[in-house]
Amino acid sequence: MGEGALAPGLQLLLRACEQGDTDTARRLLEPGGEPVAGSEAGAEPAGPEAARAVEAGTPVPVDCSDEAGNSALQLAAAGGHEPLVRFLLRRGASVNSRNHYGWSALMQAARCGHASVAHLLLDHGADVNAQNRLGASVLTVASRGGHLGVVKLLLEAGATVDHRNPSGESTASGGSRDELLGITALMAAVQHGHEAVVRLLMEWGADPNHTARTVGWSPLMLAALLGKLSVVQQLVEKGANPDHLGVLEKTAFEVALDRKHRDLADYLDPLTTVRPKTDEEKRRPDIFHALKMGNFQLVKEIADEDPNHVNLVNGDGATPLMLAAVTGQLPLVQLLVEKHADMNKQDSVHGWTALMQATYHGNKEIVKYLLNQGADVTLRAKNGYTAFDLVMLLNDPDTELVRLLASVCMQVNKDRGGRPSHRPPLPHSKARQPWSIPMLPDDKGGLKSWWSRMSNRFRKLKLMQTLPRGLAANQPLPFSDEPELALDSTMRAPPQDRTNHLGPPEAAHAAKDSGPGNPRREKDDVLLTTMLRNGAPFPRLPSDKLKAVIPPFLPPSSFELWSSDRSRTCPNGKADPMKTVLPPRASRAHPVGCVGTDGAAGRPVKFPSISRSPTSPASSGNFNHSPHSSGGASGVGSMSRLGGELHNRSGGSVDSVLSQIAAQRKKAAGLCEQKPPCQQSSPVGPATGSSPPELPASLLGSGSGSSNVTSSSKKLDPGKRPPSGTSATSKSTSPTLTPSPSPKGHTAESSVSSSSSHRQSKSSGGSSSGTITDEDELTGILKKLSLEKYQPIFEEQEVDMEAFLTLTDGDLQELGIKTDGSRQQILAAISELNAGKGRERQILQETIHNFHSSFESSASNTRAPGNSPCMAGWVRPEETVSSRR
């Protein structure tokens, strides 16, 4: 506390202790007591101020302190006032109290050489090894002042000579002793030339070679700096090392020369074996500095002068060869290896070798050279990684470097183990465990399999760079002379190498021969394109089955054509369902339009529902601009021309979809001003005959999980709404965001479609409709929020989408959702869905109108059936539907 804030009585007590006025201190501490006859001479009488302070009433505390934390006892001890110190101790003053700088009363007495006061404090339990915030002990401050009697008293009381704090105790500052300067009592006595104290400390076993950790100076160097020959002689006689070097690479002899102490220099000259460096030697850098500068000649001179320099280590345990490998200087690496540098030495921090450093920094030529020179590829760093493991951790590893290390590792495995590492190990393979590559069970792991997968990854990445951006491998190029409709779609790669779904035979033949048109070669590339466009990482190698990444729930600006409001009020007051699905690609066993379609059905395509004019099943042979009607096959055919860029947008963002819709709306605005009549669209199903067609199994992908149409052979009535179709009042905006993973074979495709069809059959009550129910949409929302565990709650309470959009926080709690974070996620989704409904409805109506106008304008330019281009999987109007097997 500041002195100005002290009470008058406290100020009087501190002043009396500083001056040794025991009488005033007694009157302040013991109101009503008799004056003490032992007041020291020279002490000023307190006078009327003390009397007024005493008359004020309250007694003064004995441990009061000033603004620096100095107590009354410390002030009395520093002044050497023994009677006052004795009186304060009798009144209960704390003997080990510290001021703000860590000084105690004993340190104050030792600093000033008051032996009697120090003895009195020691008798009352003062800490003889106390240290201040700078790490100076009681013995150090006494030695600095040259107080031989106090030093002897402290040593006899048990003071530590070198006070190295072996117990690890902390100083008053809170820092450990090792963080301080490390000045011992002997160094303090030598620095100030107290020869008698030096002799006493040496007799008590002081270390003459203790050095200050910051500057590296020893007591002998301090004596040489001071110029005390007698002190230097004492230290040398007690074993001081004259060859000790400080941080400036100087000995005590050089210090004496610099200070021009000729007598000291003459005495130390014959004792010192480390001679001073010449000016040229001082200017010459060491081998590490020469490597950093890239000075080949200087490194060669240093290595020629002393070959041991090539294996020196720095503070991190790194060698010159490691530094050269990091910097990528092949000539220096060759020079060091020729000078017998240890290629397999590991640093002390991470355990890396020169080969690991060169591998990690991508210095391929150095890696080749070190491998040719016999560097050990099996050495592991402290984290267990080898050089091959490090190159696999790089974001963009060099293919040749990976191949080089892999071949060497496989050769080592073959030479040492006799079998590839991915096979079941023999009994003697335990000896290879410390260096063998981590492997998976059986033939799914091992070095060879690992390299095979990595090679596939690099090959496919290079192939993708040759394709047009966003072009899927299994889809035909858009017509260059016709407008492209920028809509979003979701496609799935074909599972087998079939070219008969590419439309015209000549196009299929060309696609089969050429690289970009081969579905088998590039079916995984489509998924790679989707994954890269979505910004998804590669958790596994591309040769494995890549699963589509489902993005989180989109922000309020999200809008997707297939996820907007699916009910629309017509001028006549009826509801218009807005969500339908285009005809699927027909299987090879059930040709519906295009010649020779793929039996496994390619990627299912999702489009927004489009309101059309009434359909006429009887006029199936005529052109109808509704692709959803029984006679809409030609409409679907024309759709392929308009949807050129349709398949290139798989996995795109919602913002890109909006921009594409806006561009298309501008293009199609002037084509037709006629507004389509609002009428219910017919169910999905391409047909050219008067009888309704049968839907082949595993053709349509719908719902949040892209489930397929049921495999049951129920027929769709084009005049009726599917019984489990979308409700006319449903207002869900749950989008289907991602494509299904690309299966690798027909068997997998069939099993997946069968199981998903069975699930959809259950949810839709056995209907073969391709539309999405409220339950599917609600399930999709919960899946996107990663809250599938709450789905049974909504199913049990029969909560549909319309009820879901009205839920509040209290409703969710009543349903049993107790987690605050989960409720907030659901409420945010509900708010987002409700907020964007009006805007989505308006944009969707305009898009549908423009879409309809485009179809009407293309009706007048319909091509001849033989010349009309037909995309893969699309139906032709002149072909009939074959019956299901």
Swiss-Prot record:
Residues 650-662, 855-865 have a biased composition (Polar residues). The modification 3-hydroxyasparagine is found at N129. Residues 415-439, 491-522, 563-775, 855-885 are annotated as: Disordered. Residues 876-885 have a biased composition (Basic and acidic residues). ANK repeats lie at residues 8-37, 68-97, 101-130, 134-163, 181-210, 215-244, 282-312, 316-345, 350-379, 383-414. GO terms for cellular component: ciliary inversin compartment; cytoplasm. It is found in: Cell projection, Cilium; Cytoplasm. Widely expressed with moderate level in brain, skeletal muscle and testis. Expressed in renal tubules. PROSITE patterns: ANK_REP_REGION, ANK_REPEAT, SAM_DOMAIN. InterPro entries: Ankyrin-KH/SAM_domain, Ankyrin_rpt, Ankyrin_rpt-contain_sf, SAM, SAM/pointed_sf. Coiled coil: none annotated. Hydroxylated at Asn-129, most probably by HIF1AN. This hydroxylation results in decreased NEK8-binding. Keywords: ANK repeat, Cell projection, Cilium, Cytoplasm, Disease variant, Hydroxylation, Phosphoprotein, Repeat. The record marks R823 as: Essential for ANKS3 interaction. One of its GO terms (molecular function) is identical protein binding. The modification Phosphoserine is found at S650, S734, S742. Required for renal function. Homooligomer. Interacts with NEK8. Central component of a complex containing at least ANKS6, INVS, NEK8 and NPHP3. ANKS6 may organize complex assembly by linking INVS and NPHP3 to NEK8 and INVS may target the complex to the proximal ciliary axoneme. Interacts (via SAM domain) with BICC1 (via KH domains) in an RNA-dependent manner. Interacts (via SAM domain) with ANKS3 (via SAM domain). The ankyrin repeats are necessary and sufficient for NEK8-binding. This is Ankyrin repeat and SAM domain-containing protein 6. The lineage of its organism: Eukaryota, Metazoa, Chordata, Craniata, Vertebrata.
